[in-house]
UniProtKB/Swiss-Prot annotation:
Major localization listed first in the record, in broad terms: cytoplasm
GO biological process, one term: phenylalanyl-tRNA aminoacylation
Alphabetical list of HAMAP family matching this protein: Phe_tRNA_synth_alpha1
Protein name: Phenylalanine--tRNA ligase alpha subunit
Highest classification ranks of the organism: Bacteria, Pseudomonadati, Pseudomonadota, Alphaproteobacteria, Hyphomicrobiales
Length: 360
């Protein structure tokens, strides 16, 4: 066996034995580098006669080509093996369901959704949003709203009172959002068109009551506001909110200290099934209270009742959410149960609009 044949077998064996790219690179440098075995053979051609150089040069170049091709093939094989090993290690079962993102799993609470729905409806009518503090003075929560000291209507509210301060004044957790009406009248002149969503507090807890609950009120003050205007506003709201083409409403005389006359509003519905259907049926469901703003309330807000008049209404957000979406127990709103939220909650990007659908 000639010297070149022996070298070829040795190099090919080393190439086959190379287990990684580092090993194959070492073989390449040892054979084809500046001081490699094949490179050293090529250097000897200069001392040979032309005839020997032609014969031996061809054989050395053939050896060089064979080794180069073997190295290239081994590199490719090593890369393919590495990819196959990685795929086997990182196998993914494409039949498994895709894991949803946190944004997809999260839900908007029904109360937040209801507030957005109501804001969209009244915003389209030209109303703005007003807010006020949860901790109120006795004056704003009662006296300014025509609840004088000792008035029996004060007993209608199981109020959370704070201990008296250094001045002897007892603040309260507001029992309704109505104090914001007084603050708004004090802050600016009519015309006023506002809605007031917010938390309220009363000492009551059962399937339909909670110590902390949510209300929304509306207030319109100008020189010509009347009961007919109020009826139209409430009818348009009910049609948009309950997503029906027509509603039949019934106004029953009632009493609230801050309005005169006062009404409780019922809406026609069908209660024969598990979910109340509005705009049809022979039943009635009370949904809100309303009335013309009492002259004493206008005076407390700094307005002249001989010049201005207005109407107001209020409703419980938790209750109308239960009616609209068929939720059986108010206490579930505050239990932070992920299962309940997954069922009754709304997707984060499903913002309610009058044109796209309130509860899409």
């Amino acid at each position: 066996m000639s010297e070149l044949e022996t070298l070829e077998r040795t190099l090919l064996a080393e190439i086959d034995a190379a287990a990684d790219e580092g090993a194959i690179e070492a073989v390449r440098v040892g054979a084809l580098g500046k001081k490699g075995s094949i490179s050293e053979l090529l250097k000897t051609l200069g001392s040979m006669s032309p005839e020997e150089r032609q014969t031996r040069g061809a054989r050395i170049n053939a050896l060089k080509n064979t080794v180069t091709e073997a190295i290239s093939a081994r590199k490719t094989a090593l890369k393919d093996a590495a990819i196959a090993e990685r795929l086997a290690r990182e196998t993914v079962d494409i039949s498994l369901p895709v894991r949803s993102s946190p944004a997809e799993r999260g839900r908007i609470h029904p109360i937040s959704q209801i507030v957005d729905e109501i804001t969209a409806i009244f915003g389209d009518m030209g109303f703005s949003i007003a807010e006020g503090p949860d901790i109120e003075t006795d004056y704003y929560n009662f006296t300014a709203l025509n609840f004088p000291e000792g008035h029996p209507a004060r007993e209608m509210h199981d109020t959370f009172f704070f201990a008296p301060d250094e001045k002897g004044e007892r603040k309260v957790l507001r029992t309704h959002t109505s104090p914001v009406q007084i603050r708004t009248m004090e802050a600016g002149q009519p015309p006023i068109r506002i809605i007031i969503p917010g938390k309220t507090y009363r000492q009551d807890s059962d399937a339909t009551h909670s110590p902390m609950f949510h209300q929304v009120e509306g207030l319109v003050i100008d020189r010509t506001a009347n009961v007919a205007n109020m009826r139209w506003v409430l009818e348009e709201f009910c049609k948009a909110f309950f997503e029906v083409d027509q509603v039949t409403m019934r106004f029953r005389p009632s009493f609230f200290p801050f309005t005169e006359p006062s009404f409780e509003v019922d809406i026609q519905c069908d209660r024969s099934g598990p979910i109340v259907k509005f705009g049809e049926g022979k039943d009635w469901m009370e949904i809100l209270g309303c009335g013309m703003v009492h002259p004493n309330v206008l005076r407390a807000g700094g307005l002249d009742p001989d010049e201005y008049q207005g109407f107001a209404w209020g409703m419980g957000l938790d209750r109308i959410a239960m009616l609209k979406y068929g939720m059986p127990d108010l206490r579930d709103f505050f239990n932070a149960d992920v299962r309940w939220m997954t069922h009754y909650g709304f997707r984060p990007l499903d913002m309610p609009t009058l044109f796209g659908g309130l509860s899409a």
